[in-house]
Amino acid sequence: MQIIFIAAKVAVSLIFLLYASWSDYKTREVSNSVWIFYAPIALILSIVEYLIFDFSKLPFFGLSVGFTFLIAFLLFYSGGFGGADSKAFMCIALALPFSTEMLFSPITPQGVSPLAQLLFPMVIFSNSVLIAAASAGYILFRNINQRIRKHKEFFEGSLKSESFGKKLVVLITGYRIPIQKLKEKWHIYPMEDIEQTENTKNKRKLVIVPKDEGRNEILDRLSKAIESKTINNYVWSTPGLPMLIFVTIGLIAALLFGDIVWMLISFFLG
């Protein structure tokens, strides 16, 4: 019977997180109503489950939820998380504070970690960060490969004077595509803009936090600069995948594989 509660909490979490990820990807925002519905449903299911089947877990439930809330708040106020990301982890803590091993056994035994038994949301968090890092590694490798194949510098003109930090962010989150393709793909955002200065008519600058607001204006400025042959046809762009997508993938990975970081540690330490 307890397995029905766990299955319900997993299903509810996946439904809300998949919707939130889709909404964040398409509109760059998630309605608060998602969390307003998700949180109480998750809390009620968890409380009822532990009251009926495992009363001794209630104090540890409070510990898991409290610790996850603290981490989510710290990440939000330090700028590491957006509001939706923090709320997602809080809701996950209410729904899935402990390992779902009773319902989903990880594919390999190494996926079962001590952390998952007490702080399952932190396993989802570490999986999410690892998957996001792997995505950044792939994009960086792609850019290096393009640099070698085409014998072109990463940054040209005034972009050369941008800081190393900005260049690194662009290299691990974006790639160069033709302006026409950028116009056609609504979900891809420009990572550079044109700035009018006294000394130069068209100075290129990197945009490391692309936003939906002003996207069309940036594209117009870039198009005019390309038409005047001030810059070439390829501009730095990013799909700007929201962290919520990685959180959702991290949850699915935790259900199927368990704690990926623990698996890697176990593998390298033998």
Positions of predicted regions on the chain:
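A membrane-topology feature that recognizes alpha-helical transmembrane segments
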Residues: 1-270
